[in-house]
Amino acid sequence: MFEFFLKKPKRVEKNWGYELIFANDEANNYCGKILHLYQGHKFSMHFHDIKCETFYILNGKVQVSLLDLTSKNGNISVHTLNAGDCLDLPRLQPHQVEAIEESDIIEASTFHRDEDSYRIWR
């Protein structure tokens, strides 16, 4: 017989809002979160050595800054994402998200490890 487990997501408070972690399975290498960002708040420019992420903008509007790793000058490209937009972030891609409006983002990724986040700047 198939077993299933009902559970509540884990809420993690952040300076920019909070995360609702509804899945983080190391054995099967996947993670699911909802990132809630308060208007005008952003998380640090950072990257992951192992983790790959896909963002789906559930509601609101965000600005995503991507650091160009091929540029010697550290060029940054800025992209506005609206509800319904998706963004794939490969491992090692520095990124920062700022909420233009209060926003919810569904994050689907490989397994999340706290020690796999490398901050470049706040």
Regions found by a protein language model. Give the residues of each.
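His/acidic/aromatic-lined binding-pocket segments of jelly-roll/cupin-type domains
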Residues: I34-L35, H46-F47, C52-I57, H79, ...
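Double-stranded beta-helix
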Residues: F4-P9, K14, T70-S71, P94-R122
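Glycine- and acidic-residue-biased ligand/ion/polar-headgroup-sensing regions
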Residues: I50-T70
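Short beta-strand His + acidic residue motifs that chelate non-heme Fe in jelly-roll/DSBH
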Residues: S44-H46, V64-S65, D88-L89, P94-I100, ...
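ATP/adenylate-binding site constellation spanning eukaryotic-like Ser/Thr protein kinases
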Residues: G40, N59, E102
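A short, N-terminal "cap"/entry segment at the start of jelly-roll beta-barrel domains
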Residues: M1-K33, K42-S44, N75-H79
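Short, surface-exposed loop/turn motifs at beta-strand boundaries within globular domains
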Residues: A27-Y30, Y38, D49-I50
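Short acidic-glycine-tyrosine-enriched beta hairpin
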Residues: D68-L92
